Regions:
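ALDH superfamily catalytic-core signature
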Residues: 1-110
Length: 110
């Protein structure tokens, strides 16, 4: 396998893991700097990886991400998205509460 491709795979996985950790990492960064030469491919692959994340019941072994831990955390995330949009940010994927269909679908899914 090409070393550049392996590096890109690791960088994508790192970005996805830091951005989708539900606040469980004390050192979670808030930005990523992507070189313009690889930006388009990097973002396309990140969005594909993010779209593959299965939300749902934390007790289901197929679930990759459960709900946020509290209403306050969900509201904080929502407020950050709203601020970003108000300041001109473009939402590339998601950006709203997830629609779930199961027993605890009213949980704090985003």
């Amino acid at each position: 396998m090409d070393h550049d491709d392996e590096f890109l795979d690791k960088a994508i996985e790192g970005l996805v893991l830091y951005a989708f950790n539900k606040g469980e990492v004390c050192t979670a960064p808030s930005r990523a700097l992507i070189h313009e030469d690889i930006y388009d491919e990097f973002m396309a692959r990140c969005l594909t990886r993010i779209a593959a994340i299965k939300q749902g019941d934390p007790l289901d072994t197929e679930t990759m991400m459960g709900p946020q831990v509290s209403k306050q955390q969900l509201e904080k995330i929502t407020s950050y998205v709203d601020i970003g949009i108000a300041e001109g940010a473009e939402v590339l994927i998601g950006g709203h509460r997830a629609t779930m269909e199961w027993e605890f679908a009213d949980g704090y899914f985003f």
